[in-house]
């Protein structure tokens, strides 16, 4: 399974949104209805799933699905 597909599944599970709504440009808060706690839980789920650590200063910059995909791919090398 691709990183993108797994990220989308995590978002769908955590936020209860339909997969079709999870586009690279979708913003977690504005488009997918996440609140600040949801975002923290998403970051933790991404860290666990992909074996990366996302420091708070980096997490604050992650606002869209594309942001998290780019971040994970950059850390996986």
Swiss-Prot record:
Q: Which Pfam families match?
A: PP-binding
Q: Where is the Carrier domain?
A: 1-76
Identify the keywords attached in UniProt to this record, alphabetized: Cytoplasm, Fatty acid biosynthesis, Fatty acid metabolism, Lipid biosynthesis, Lipid metabolism, Phosphopantetheine, Phosphoprotein
User: Which cysteines form disulfides?
Assistant: none
- Pathway it belongs to? Lipid metabolism; fatty acid biosynthesis
Q: PTM details?
A: 4'-phosphopantetheine is transferred from CoA to a specific serine of apo-ACP by AcpS. This modification is essential for activity because fatty acids are bound in thioester linkage to the sulfhydryl of the prosthetic group.
Residue list for modification O-(pantetheine 4'-phosphoryl)serine? 36
* SMART domains named in the record: PKS_PP (SM00823)
What are the BP-aspect GO terms?
Answer: lipid A biosynthetic process
Its Gene Ontology cellular component terms are: cytosol; membrane
Record has Lipid metabolism as a keyword? yes
One GO MF term attached to the UniProt entry: acyl binding
Query: Which Gene3D superfamilies has this protein been placed in?
Result: ACP-like
InterPro entries from the UniProt entry: ACP, ACP-like_sf, PKS_PP-bd, PP-bd_ACP, Ppantetheine_attach_site
Q: Where does this protein reside within or beyond the cell? A: Cytoplasm
Q: What does this protein do?
A: Carrier of the growing fatty acid chain in fatty acid biosynthesis.
Write out the similarity annotation. Belongs to the acyl carrier protein (ACP) family.
Family annotation (NCBIfam families): acyl_carrier (TIGR00517), PRK00982.1-2 (NF002148), PRK00982.1-3 (NF002149), PRK00982.1-4 (NF002150), PRK00982.1-5 (NF002151)
Protein name according to UniProt: Acyl carrier protein
**Organism annotation:** Sulfurihydrogenibium sp. (strain YO3AOP1)
């Amino acid at each position: 399974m691709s990183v993108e597909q797994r990220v989308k599944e995590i978002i769908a599970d955590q936020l209860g949104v339909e997969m079709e709504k999870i586009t690279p440009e979708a913003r977690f808060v504005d488009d997918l209805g996440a609140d600040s706690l949801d975002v923290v839980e998403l970051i933790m789920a991404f860290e666990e799933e992909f074996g990366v650590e996302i420091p708070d200063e980096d997490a604050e910059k992650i606002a869209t699905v594309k942001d998290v995909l780019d971040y994970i791919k950059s850390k996986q090398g």
